[in-house]
Amino acid sequence: MNNFAKRIIPCLDVNNGRVVKGVNFVNLIDAGDPVEVAKIYNDSGADELCFLDITASFENRDTIVEVVRNVASELFIPLTVGGGIRKIDDISRLLEAGCDKVSINSAAIKNPNFIDEAAKKFGSQCIVVAIDAKKTDQGYHVFINGGRVDTKIDVFSWSKEVENRGCGEILLTSMDRDGTKSGFDNYLTGKVSKSLGIPVIASGGAGCMEHIRDTFLAGADAALAASIFHFGEIKIDDLKRYLRTQNIEVRL
């Protein structure tokens, strides 16, 4: 299989070591158990898995390391973990526990040198920069703190900067589309993707198979979604067969 196959990535929110926002699979014994959920996705054709650690309290940060350790032993597809990663030590611990990539967001904005340091120490292939984009009167801006704070930084110049600093991939979320199921922001995805030499993961807005096809046609290298997969609205193997009929290269 060539390296240009498009990737499908389910995303799970993990809070204090438990999957939240419900996962609705018929054959799932415990929908809150990350290991159970990861195994199902591993076996159902997902290309990668993404965990977003939304644990609020710092004292519980150790839980995500344990989760990664437990999940990694059962998982044969790459695992990316994001949420609250602020220090080189955070990355070391997660990679040692068995995760393949880490996703950094607010910390990259607050200290852009963190990207350079992380890429230099662990290699670009491990470092994903998550960009939460929202349309404003002044154009697309980068938002942080869960989409609450407008940094006033232009998304297109920031994505170029993080590439230059050594990140290996961008996770680009449209805050406007997130949760709407009305389709990805393909203008945003396409413009970022065409300006960069690194892969772009599109996120925010997936509601049907056509939406995922359209974001790939716009230039996304991977599509990330949550509820449409978790609630069984779209089965990944069905999605991949559909994409094949649309002449989009995927791994079956």
Swiss-Prot record:
Protein name in UniProt: Imidazole glycerol phosphate synthase subunit HisF
Source organism of the structure: Campylobacter hominis (strain ATCC BAA-381 / DSM 21671 / CCUG 45161 / LMG 19568 / NCTC 13146 / CH001A)
Q: Which domain of life is it from?
A: Bacteria
What pathway or pathways are given for this protein in its record? Amino-acid biosynthesis; L-histidine biosynthesis; L-histidine from 5-phospho-alpha-D-ribose 1-diphosphate: step 5/9
Instruction: Give the record's family classification.
Output: Belongs to the HisA/HisF family.
What does this gene product do?
A: IGPS catalyzes the conversion of PRFAR and glutamine to IGP, AICAR and glutamate. The HisF subunit catalyzes the cyclization activity that produces IGP and AICAR from PRFAR using the ammonia provided by the HisH subunit.
Which Gene3D superfamilies has this protein been placed in? Aldolase class I
Q: Which PANTHER family match?
A: IMIDAZOLE GLYCEROL PHOSPHATE SYNTHASE HISHF, IMIDAZOLE GLYCEROL PHOSPHATE SYNTHASE SUBUNIT HISF/H IGP SYNTHASE SUBUNIT HISF/H
Report the locations given in the UniProt record: Cytoplasm
In the record, which residues are listed under signal peptide?
none
- Keyword entries, A-Z: Amino-acid biosynthesis, Cytoplasm, Histidine biosynthesis, Lyase
